[in-house]
Design a protein with these regions (language model features):
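Small-residue-biased structural context
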Residues: 1-143
Length: 143
């Protein structure tokens, strides 16, 4: 339930990046900026679903500390920084930097998503909290 929803949200975020990358590659800066705004929102909403809803539910059972949830939060921080740098490169109309940040974003995000999908979401499915209520809470973040 949660694993499927969050995995699909990963795919949806990925799908928003592809046309953005194409616009950057073609130096269509107005279009790139138009695409960047909803892309960034989708990514930040995804992180908020995890950090504000899912992770606290999980931490009730597994604790915080420096385990997998802590690592995911740290990676979110790094990815946020890359997304911000990507936006700055788009505003500066710097194709090389924008494509570089985009490539870094894709590599980091693919590795990050794999860890979440294979480890964290699987763990979440096994913990004894109300999955339906949690899913509804996460969906409110997206709206």
């Amino acid at each position: 339930m949660i694993k499927e929803f969050m995995t699909q949200d990963h795919r949806d975020c990925d799908a928003q990046y592809a046309p953005l990358e194409e616009a950057i590659s073609k130096e269509e800066w107005d279009r790139a900026l138009e695409l960047y705004v909803p892309f960034k929102k989708a990514m930040l909403d995804h992180f908020a679903m995890e950090e504000d809803v899912l992770f606290p539910k999980m931490e009730e059972f597994v604790g915080g500390g420096e385990g997998p949830i802590y690592v995911m939060k740290m990676e979110h921080s790094q990815i946020r920084s890359i997304i911000d740098s990507l936006g700055q490169a788009i505003e500066a109309k710097d194709r090389q930097k924008a494509l570089g940040y985009g490539e870094t974003f894709m590599i980091m995000t693919q590795q990050h998503n794999m860890k979440e999908e294979q480890i964290l979401y699987t763990m979440a499915e096994q913990l004894p909290f109300d999955k339906e209520a949690t899913l509804q809470e996460m969906q409110k973040v997206k709206s």
